[in-house]
């Protein structure tokens, strides 16, 4: 729009009168949740997803659309992002949480009952393997490398200028 220089936080507020209470369900007061300070991402795992309209759509100074177009597109962006996120979480959050739980349970089970016993077994066997490897190295590989080294150390190279 060109007139605003700071990012704006867009929020959608609805009065209690606009809710339909005919179903008998009681809706929570949105101000209670806003004041409770409940952070669902305390470790900032998804801080990269906190994008605003200005982070996605930007008009250079030389090309500005009409202010009303900019305001409407900003509002539609925020509302569609909000509505689509809510819509997708209604249908995907529970099945994906279920699948993630199954995946993490499977990986935990494999780690606890297969991988760690295998690693501990390897660590138990390694001292004897280390002893055998040291014996093979001392008996076969070390003399072979020493003889090759002595053979090459006796080679001398002389350069003559012709």
Curated annotation (Swiss-Prot):
Top-level taxon of the source organism: Eukaryota
One Pfam family of this chain: Caveolin
GO biological process: caveola assembly; endoplasmic reticulum organization; insulin receptor signaling pathway; mitochondrion organization; negative regulation of endothelial cell proliferation; positive regulation of dopamine receptor signaling pathway; regulation of cytosolic calcium ion concentration; skeletal muscle fiber development
Subcellular location: Nucleus; Cytoplasm; Golgi apparatus membrane; Cell membrane
Record's bilayer topology term: Peripheral membrane protein
An annotated GO cellular component: focal adhesion
Mod. after translation: Phosphorylated on serine and tyrosine residues. CAV1 promotes phosphorylation on Ser-23 which then targets the complex to the plasma membrane, lipid rafts and caveolae. Phosphorylation on Ser-36 appears to modulate mitosis in endothelial cells. Phosphorylation on both Tyr-19 and Tyr-27 is required for insulin-induced 'Ser-727' phosphorylation of STAT3 and its activation. Phosphorylation on Tyr-19 is required for insulin-induced phosphorylation of MAPK1 and DNA binding of STAT3. Tyrosine phosphorylation is induced by both EGF and insulin (By. similarity).
Positions of post-translational Phosphotyrosine modification: 19, 27
Membrane in keyword set: yes
Keyword annotations from UniProtKB, A to Z: Cell membrane, Cytoplasm, Golgi apparatus, Membrane, Nucleus, Phosphoprotein
Membrane-inserted regions that do not cross the membrane: 87-107
InterPro entries: Caveolin, Caveolin_CS
Topology, Cytoplasmic side: 1-86, 108-162
Function: May act as a scaffolding protein within caveolar membranes. Interacts directly with G-protein alpha subunits and can functionally regulate their activity. Acts as an accessory protein in conjunction with CAV1 in targeting to lipid rafts and driving caveolae formation. The Ser-36 phosphorylated form has a role in modulating mitosis in endothelial cells. Positive regulator of cellular mitogenesis of the MAPK signaling pathway. Required for the insulin-stimulated nuclear translocation and activation of MAPK1 and STAT3, and the subsequent regulation of cell cycle progression.
Family affiliation: Belongs to the caveolin family.
PANTHER family cross-referenced by the UniProt entry: CAVEOLIN (PTHR10844), CAVEOLIN-2 (PTHR10844:SF3)
Self-association and partners: Monomer or homodimer. Interacts with CAV1; the interaction forms a stable heterooligomeric complex that is required for targeting to lipid rafts and for caveolae formation. Tyrosine phosphorylated forms do not form heterooligomers with the Tyr-19-phosphorylated form existing as a monomer or dimer, and the Tyr-27-form as a monomer only. Interacts (tyrosine phosphorylated form) with the SH2 domain-containing proteins, RASA1, NCK1 and SRC. Interacts (tyrosine phosphorylated form) with INSR, the interaction (Tyr-27-phosphorylated form) is increased on insulin stimulation.
Name the UniProt record assigns to this protein: Caveolin-2
Organism the protein comes from: Ateles geoffroyi
């Amino acid at each position: 729009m060109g007139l605003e220089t700071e990012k704006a936080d867009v929020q959608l507020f609805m009065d209690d009168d606009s809710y339909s209470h005919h179903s008998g369900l009681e809706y929570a007061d949105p101000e209670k949740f806003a004041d409770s300070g409940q952070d669902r991402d305390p470790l900032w795992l998804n801080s990269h997803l906190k994008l605003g309209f200005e982070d996605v759509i930007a008009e250079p100074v030389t090309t500005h659309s009409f202010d009303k177009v900019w305001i409407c597109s900003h509002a539609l962006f925020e509302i569609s992002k909000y509505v689509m996120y809510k819509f997708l979480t209604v249908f995907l959050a529970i099945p994906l949480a279920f699948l993630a739980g199954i995946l993490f349970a499977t990986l935990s089970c494999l780690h606890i009952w297969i991988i760690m016993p295998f690693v501990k077994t390897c660590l138990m066997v390694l001292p004897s393997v280390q002893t055998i490897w040291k014996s093979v190295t001392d008996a076969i590989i070390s003399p072979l490398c020493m003889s090759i080294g002595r053979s090459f150390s006796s080679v001398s190279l002389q350069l003559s200028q012709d």
